[in-house]
Amino acid sequence: MKRILLIICMALFSNSILAQNSFKENSATIEAFFEKYRDTKNITTIEIGPAMVKILAAGMVISGEDDKEAMDLLRSIKSIDIMVENQEGMSHITGEMFELAKLCKGFELISSISQEGEVCRFYFASHDDSDICEFLMLVRQADQRVLMYITGGFSVSDISALGAMGGNIL
């Protein structure tokens, strides 16, 4: 009985370590992509760390239930990284940007929108036995490409609520 309990504990512990390793690997892969293109012409990068997220949350005025949900979501976010490329036509980073979701572990496509050559994809990764989740949004338009990567302790439904609230949050 002790042996079985020990095996179960070891399995749970190893899953926790693997989940944390997947998150670290994903973060490193996306950070390397940001670093590669950070000083490139026509590319803007925005990185919002935990301290700035707290400042944003502290500056919000809560007036209703939606605002309370937004505040809870903001408190659960650890970081937001955004890359925007403004350039007409296809760019050299488009293919590489859309490969990120395949290179990163655990990302699941949760929604994809395609219309007249424009594409928007949403990916979500939740790591077993870890409170860290990742959200990746990739957008390709005729004159712009956008990558948004959010990490924190949230769920798919939290991200859905964020989308429903739209510009009312930030």
Language-model-detected regions and their locations in the chain:
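Bacterial Sec-dependent N-terminal signal peptides
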Residues: 1-24
